[in-house]
Amino acid sequence: MYTASSSAETLRTVRRRSVPSSSMPYLALAHNRVSSLNHAASVDGWGTSHRNVADSFSRTSRSCSRFLKGTAGSARREDWNGHLQPWIPRPDRRGWETADRKGERTQVHGLRRSLGPRAPHPGAHRALRPAQSCRSGPRGWTPCRCRGRGPTACRRGS
C-alpha cells in the first residue's frame, strides 16, 4: 500500500535542502496532489508500474492504463487456453461431446472444431487495436491517428 507522507514533513525536508521560500507553497500543493493520486491508485489495487497517475509537473500520464489493464481487445486467459488446446477435453465445461478418434470433429458450445493441434492466426496474441486514448502503445505500434481509419490502421510496422 502507498503511505503518504504529510505536506509538513515534505516542507521540513525541503527546507533542509535549501529551496527558495517563495516556491514552498507550490511544492506543498504539488506534493498533496501527487500523494492523493498515488493513494487512490494503490487503493485501486494497481502496483507502481501499472498506475496511470498524472505527473503534477508535466501534466502527462505515466502509462496507458487501457493497455496495461488489457481492455484494448485482448482476450481472457480461459478463452485462449480453449483456443490453443482444443484437443484436450474439459469435462468441467458443459457442452463437450467427446470424439472417438483423433481427427474427428467435435462440437463445443455449438461451435464445430476439429481435433488436433492447430496454431491460431498470426498476431492472435496482440490486441486488435489500441484504445482510443492511447498514444504510447507497445514498441513499434503506430497509433490510429497517424494511419487513418480502416482495417490496417493500427497494425505494427511502417
UniProtKB/Swiss-Prot annotation:
Residues 90-107 have a biased composition (Basic and acidic residues). Residues 75-158 are annotated as: Disordered. This is Putative uncharacterized protein OBSCN-AS1. The gene is OBSCN-AS1.
